[in-house]
């Protein structure tokens, strides 16, 4: 964890963007990401146990059975107890790791039957197009806009370098969302670490993910599929606002377009 991450830890301030020298995960913004963090901690617990156990056996063997203390090594042809233990325990530990891992994996693949909102994310070289297809179903209106990265020499005060865009994806917090991901040219990827999602954008194919952002904030992500020269300069910015403010934020920032984009 970086010094900035330690500062966030003690001040209880969320970490929703990549930081220099960051080693840990970003703070969870969705139940999916919280599940990933919990699984990481659970697996790390078993790794520590294995490390301590193996290290103790190794140190004990080096200390008690080196050549000076034991010039004539003892030959053990058969050990039933040891063979049983070394077979059972390596079989049980992967079970404790696999069961929660598969449970999380299947939950990540679940799709909400009736999402409150659907957003389509289309990858381009090197920007993204977002479509709020059900922005106003009664008027058959949709919102479509392009999202470009802000150049390195043109950020405003407080904006993250090469992580900010001109048009953010504004979503309501604590709402079930369906995001449809595709590409218009080459393979891309739509990934936001704080949300625990990474979905490939494949030309001619529609992939979908379901998320529910649990707290308001601004969440940063990047393309995670090498897509050409400017692959590193296609960030993703998702801004979660309250349901009360969502309508006014979208209406003020974006221009509705009638019909499909």
Curated annotation (Swiss-Prot):
Report keywords, A-Z.
Answer: Copper, Electron transport, Magnesium, Membrane, Metal-binding, Mitochondrion, Mitochondrion inner membrane, Respiratory chain, Translocase, Transmembrane, Transmembrane helix, Transport
Q: Which GO terms describe its cellular component?
A: mitochondrial inner membrane
InterPro entries associated with the record: CcO_II, CcO_II-like_C, CcO_II_C, Cupredoxin, Cyt_c_oxidase_su2, Cyt_c_oxidase_su2_TM_dom, Cyt_c_oxidase_su2_TM_sf
Query: What is the cofactor note?
Result: Binds a dinuclear copper A center per subunit.
For Cu cation A2, which residues are the binding ones? 223, 225, 227, 231
Q: Which residues lie on this side of the membrane: Mitochondrial matrix?
A: 56-87
> Which residues take part in binding Mg(2+)?
225
| PROSITE patterns in the cross-refs | COX2_CUA, COX2_TM
Q: Which stretches are Mitochondrial intermembrane in the membrane topology?
A: 1-34, 109-261
Q: Where does Cu cation A1 bind?
A: 188, 223, 227
Give compartment(s): Mitochondrion inner membrane
Which transformation does this protein catalyse, written as a reaction? 4 Fe(II)-[cytochrome c] + O2 + 8 H(+)(in) = 4 Fe(III)-[cytochrome c] + 2 H2O + 4 H(+)(out)
Membrane topology term reads: Multi-pass membrane protein
Which ranges does the record mark as transmembrane?
Answer: 35-55, 88-108
Q: Does the keyword Hydrolase apply?
A: no
What's one Pfam family the UniProt record gives for this protein? COX2
GO molecular-function terms, A-Z: copper ion binding; cytochrome-c oxidase activity
**What are its E.C. numbers?**
7.1.1.9
Cofactor(s) needed, names only, are: Cu cation
Q: Which GO terms describe its biological process?
A: ATP synthesis coupled electron transport
Function statement: Component of the cytochrome c oxidase, the last enzyme in the mitochondrial electron transport chain which drives oxidative phosphorylation. The respiratory chain contains 3 multisubunit complexes succinate dehydrogenase (complex II, CII), ubiquinol-cytochrome c oxidoreductase (cytochrome b-c1 complex, complex III, CIII) and cytochrome c oxidase (complex IV, CIV), that cooperate to transfer electrons derived from NADH and succinate to molecular oxygen, creating an electrochemical gradient over the inner membrane that drives transmembrane transport and the ATP synthase.
Give the PANTHER family listed for this entry: CYTOCHROME C OXIDASE SUBUNIT 2 (PTHR22888:SF9), CYTOCHROME C OXIDASE, SUBUNIT II (PTHR22888)
Q: Which family does it belong to?
A: Belongs to the cytochrome c oxidase subunit 2 family.
Quaternary context:
Component of the cytochrome c oxidase (complex IV, CIV), a multisubunit enzyme composed of a catalytic core of 3 subunits and several supernumerary subunits. The complex exists as a monomer or a dimer and forms supercomplexes (SCs) in the inner mitochondrial membrane with ubiquinol-cytochrome c oxidoreductase (cytochrome b-c1 complex, complex III, CIII).
Protein name per its UniProtKB record: Cytochrome c oxidase subunit 2
Natural source organism: Daucus carota
């Amino acid at each position: 964890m970086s010094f900035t991450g330690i500062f966030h830890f003690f001040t209880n301030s969320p970490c929703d963007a990549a930081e220099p020298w960051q080693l840990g995960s970003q703070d969870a913004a969705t139940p999916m990401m919280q599940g990933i963090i919990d699984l990481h901690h659970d697996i790390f617990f078993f790794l520590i146990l294995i490390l301590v156990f193996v290290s103790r056996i190794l140190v004990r063997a080096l200390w008690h059975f080196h050549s000076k203390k034991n010039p004539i090594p003892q030959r053990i042809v058969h050990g039933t107890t040891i063979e049983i233990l070394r077979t059972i325990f390596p079989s049980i530990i992967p079970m404790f790791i696999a069961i929660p891992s598969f449970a999380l994996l299947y939950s990540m693949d679940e799709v909400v039957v009736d999402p409150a909102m659907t957003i389509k994310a289309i990858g381009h070289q090197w920007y993204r197009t977002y479509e709020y297809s059900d922005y106003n179903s009664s008027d058959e209106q949709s919102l479509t806009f392009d999202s470009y990265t802000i150049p390195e020499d043109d950020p405003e005060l407080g904006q993250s370098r090469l992580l900010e865009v001109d048009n953010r994806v504004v979503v309501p917090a604590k709402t079930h969302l369906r995001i449809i991901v595709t590409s218009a040219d080459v393979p891309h990827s739509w990934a936001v670490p704080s949300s625990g999602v990474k979905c490939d954008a494949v030309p001619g194919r529609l992939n979908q993910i379901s998320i529910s952002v649990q707290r308001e904030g601004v969440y940063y992500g990047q393309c995670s599929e090498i897509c050409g020269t400017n692959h590193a300069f296609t960030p993703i910015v998702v801004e979660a606002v309250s349901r009360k403010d969502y309508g006014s934020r979208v209406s003020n920032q974006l221009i509705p377009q009638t019909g499909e984009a």
